[in-house]
Amino acid sequence: MKSIRSKFMLLTVCTILIALGIATWIGVTAIRELGRNDADEMLHLTSTTGAMHIENYFESVEQSVETVSNLVQDSFDGMPYEELEAQVENVRNLFIRIAYHTNGVLTYYFRIDPEISETVKGFWYVYEEENGFQEHEVTDISQYDTNDTSKLVWFTVPKATGEGVWLPPYNTENLGAAVISYNVPVYWEDRFIGVIGIEVAYETLTQEVENIEIFQTGYAFLLDENLNLKPQIV
């Protein structure tokens, strides 16, 4: 009887241990899966929120340029050629107010195609830490083939496409600074007359990305259309 009882107790204990082992394994697996799901949801939420924040920033820059562009197009409608210089001055006074209300602007400009005028060149303003926006000498566009989209991309690309365009990171000819820019072509009597644009310091974009925090060791990055890793320019 003792032998049978001992065997029965041993079998019961083994059954309990097996049941506990299975329950523990199920519990650990469930907790691990729950943690994985929570991590996935957190990653998705963080990336979505970060992307929306950056997208909103891009849209604010676009809106600033498009606002100036639309006002310029309206003022140029029916304008005599002799008033070109005066209208450019009006744009100058308008643009500076909008630029100060757009975060991260490094430069803004309105450049006239030299095929339209050899004397009215437009303007180019650069933000300086202590002095705000200051006018700088403009690039001599007449020294370039404006049909060659590999040069002066901020001018030649919107001229070629005929629409507003974001340009990938490039170095400005005069400042040697890495920037991205949004540029819109301007027309007068259905003829291309110049480009309005804003350049944003590339550092501003990288800071927006670096501000996206994912747990303790995670990080965010961007990929361009060629799958180049950002924030570094490669």
Where are these regions (language model features)?
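Juxtamembrane extracytoplasmic/periplasmic/luminal helical "stalk" adjacent to the first N-terminal
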Residues: 4-11, 15-86, 104, 164, ...
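Juxtamembrane transmembrane-helix termini
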Residues: 29-36, 132, 207-210
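Extracytoplasmic/periplasmic sensory segments of membrane signal-transduction proteins
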Residues: 59-163
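Solvent-exposed, extracytoplasmic
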Residues: 88-100, 195, 199-234
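Short loop/turn microsegments at loop-to-beta-strand junctions
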Residues: 106, 181-182, 217-219
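Active-site-proximal beta-strand/loop segments in catalytic clefts of secreted hydrolases
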Residues: 111-113, 169-170, 225
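Extracytoplasmic/periplasmic ligand-binding sensor regions of membrane-associated signaling proteins
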Residues: 130-203, 207
